[in-house]
Each structure stands twice: as structure tokens, then as C-alpha cells.
Amino acid sequence: MSTDKTNQSWGGRFSEPVDAFVARFTASVDFDKRLYRHDIMGSIAHATMLAQVGVLNDKERDTIIDGLKTIQGEIEAGNFDWRVDLEDVHMNIEARLTDRIGITGKKLHTGRSRNDQVATDIRLWLRDEIDIILGEITRLQQGLLEQAEREAETIMPGFTHLQTAQPVTFGHHLLAWFEMLSRDYERLVDCRKRANRMPLGSAALAGTTYPIDRELTCKLLGFEAVAGNSLDGVSDRDFAIEFCAAASIAMMHLSRFSEELVLWTSAQFQFIDLPDRFCTGSSIMPQKKNPDVPELVRGKTGRVFGALTGLLTLMKGQPLAYNKDNQEDKEPLFDAADTLRDSLRAFADMIPAIKPKHAIMREAALRGFSTATDLADYLVRRGLPFRDCHEIVGHAVKYGVDTGKDLAEMSLDELRQFSDQIEQDVFAVLTLEGSVNARNHIGGTAPAQVRAAVARGKALLASR
């Protein structure tokens, strides 16, 4: 049976064309065509290897490679006719290659299946995407370090349960996000190592009878290692799941950061101002300046969580080896990578432009008895057990609530009614500056420690 009657490369087994709706339903070219560059890269390496082992002659190799490069140019110029009836990016490129160079184009697929071809393409694509994302994480971290250095002495309230807890510096707070992003960076670097293993040569599932040189192809494509089992090579999507897991954690961090930015820009907090270019207005309320960028990042986080759940669900019931189910791996993976990359880019642009409102931050830190723990620590240094100190300060705070006075606003006589161990020097520890400066250890909020942490952060980024 001629393949012309079915319009498919695999049509020899079939006696009628695929139903038109089924062709549209099963086609993936609308979304997997973004793999074209990596598909061509893999094909060039495959053709090079086939010539090296004698399956192709040098002229055939060169003709194929020239044809593939021409096709890449057509695609990038917008002159390529993507055909749904050819199913996917692989068959579209192969069909166009055969149109251009004739029967030699049909030799390219020797020793290869679309199963190992697509697995290779996705890994090549993801490897590049991770590199871009790592660059955006670094750019965001650079912005955080710059802000933290500027704001090393800016005091704001630290919160637990969204209630005022203790004074911290704004620089210290920003560096918490730097630490989270460092872990995200490490996870993605680790994920990239496992994505960077080459399945090409696994063929459909059992390998191939041709004398292929997988080590050569591996070297040409820059993979770190060859997949060690052909069944696993074509069916493994762990790397995609692992990426989506790492992306989900990174997006969770950005979502938490977004929530703080939304709160801080509100009229109730007014801690920071976002430049107009990162905000939008209201169609009905003229006064509104909405923090749409952090809100949207917070909302998009659910998409990435969904991609992870979708891929886990996709894979959980599949027997070895390749199944058509795996066509559904690309859209969630693509979307997760796009969403994380764009969210990081938005934050990397926005964070250096944040303008903190120093006076409002400081005034907020003065509310809520934020130096209560410092008073308890003062009494401990006077020889009292911490639990007794905790209770003493609790009584003092209750008195402050009843009288409308912060601890630092009380007179010495007022404070001494709770403990005769309190002396005039107590007021040095009840100031905001005294509180933050007292926490002068690695990881603490003291300005000196913030500057030291910034220096360590700069060294870390320089080492990448």
C-alpha cells in the first residue's frame, strides 16, 4: 500500500486515511513545533553519526545537513508550511527535507524512532530553558542584593502570624528571598544534570540493529551521558516532572513574595511604592493603582502547580515503553517553563525599582511592642530565668495596651513596677536600633550582618 493513500510515513500497514477529526485530535504540531531548532540539531548530529559508521556516505550527510539548515532558515523566516496532517514537528521537517533533497531525505530516520527523537528534543529544549531561567534567577538575586545593601539600616516590623513580632531591617528581609532563590537555583542545576542524558539511539524501545555510535552523538549534542536502557530512554519523563517540581517551588517563593508586595503597597501598609510601569489602573475608580504584576505572578503559580500534578497523573498508569499519552507531556512542561521564566523576568525588572517608605516602615515597627523580647533578654542578663522574664514582660505589655504606651514610651518608674531589676540602661535596648544591632551574628538582622550577607551573596553570584 502506498503511503500516498494515507498521507503518512507509517501508512504501509493501513488501508484508508486517518479520519480528518482524528488527524486533528492526535496532531501535536500546533504546540510541539517550538521544538524545531532542537529537532534539527538532533537530526544533524544523527546524520553525522550515520555517516561516521558508514550508513550514509559523506555526500548524503552533507546534503541532509544543508537541507536541514535551509529548513531552519525557512521556519525562522516564517516561510514554513506547518501541516496538521503530518502530525508533529518531526514529520513536518522530515517531509519538507524529502521535498527539498529527494530520496536522500528518507534515509535520515535510519536507526531512529520518533520515540527516541522526541525524548531527545525535549531534553535539549529543557536544557536550554533551564539555562535561561538560571540567568533570570541570578538577575533577580542581583537586584535583591542591590536593594538589601541600600536598605541595610532601614528598619521595619518583622511579622509572625502577620502580627508585629520584632524589628528587622528591610535589607535583612530582602535577603530571605535571596536565600530561597539560591535553593531554587541549586534545584534547577541538579535537575539539569538528569535532563542532560541522551536517549537517542534507543529507537522505538529495544535499540537498533544498525552499528550506531551513541557516544559520538552524545558528544555532538553536548549531553553528559547516554541513557543506559533503551526502554527507559524512550519512556522516561522524570526529568520533566522534576523540572515542574523545582519550578513549582520557585513559583511558590515568588507567590509568597508577591503577597508581601501586594500587602506592602496597600493603603493599610504603605511600606513601598511600585513604579507605575509595573501597575495598572481601574476602569471605574480613578484613584486606583493596582499591583498587577505581583498579583498575576501569584495567580500564575497555580498553573505551574497544575503542570506538576498533570505530569504525575499522566505518567502514573503507563506501562513500558512509549505510549501516546506522552504527547500530553509537552504543553504542561512548556507552560511551566514559560510561566516561571516570565515571572522571574518580571520580578528581576521590578525589584530594583521598589521604593521603600522609610518613615512609614519605622513608625510601623514602633507599634505592637516589637522590642518586648529585647526587654525579656535584658532581664535574663540580669540573672532572672527566661520564663519569669517572659511573664514579667507580658504584664508590662498588658499595661502598655491599657495605657496606650509602647515599652520605650514608659517611664523608668512605670517599668520598675514590673521588676526592680530594670535600670536606666534599659532604654538602650528598647530602641529599634538597639534591637536590630543586638542581633549581630551570622544570619542576624543587624546592619553589619546584612552587609556581610550581601558580600557573601555577591561572591556566590560571581562564582556561577
UniProtKB/Swiss-Prot annotation:
UniProt subcellular location: Cytoplasm
GO cellular component, one term: cytosol
Designated gene of the protein: argH
Membership in a protein family: Belongs to the lyase 1 family. Argininosuccinate lyase subfamily.
EC number: 4.3.2.1
The protein's enzyme class: lyase
Pathway per the UniProt entry: Amino-acid biosynthesis; L-arginine biosynthesis; L-arginine from L-ornithine and carbamoyl phosphate: step 3/3
Organism: Pseudomonas entomophila (strain L48)
Reactions that this protein is recorded to catalyse: 2-(N(omega)-L-arginino)succinate = fumarate + L-arginine
Name recorded for this polypeptide: Argininosuccinate lyase
InterPro entries attached to this UniProt entry: Arg_succ_lyase_C (IPR029419), Argininosuccinate_lyase (IPR009049), Fumarase/histidase_N (IPR024083), Fumarate_lyase_CS (IPR020557), Fumarate_lyase_fam (IPR000362), Fumarate_lyase_N (IPR022761), L-Aspartase-like (IPR008948)
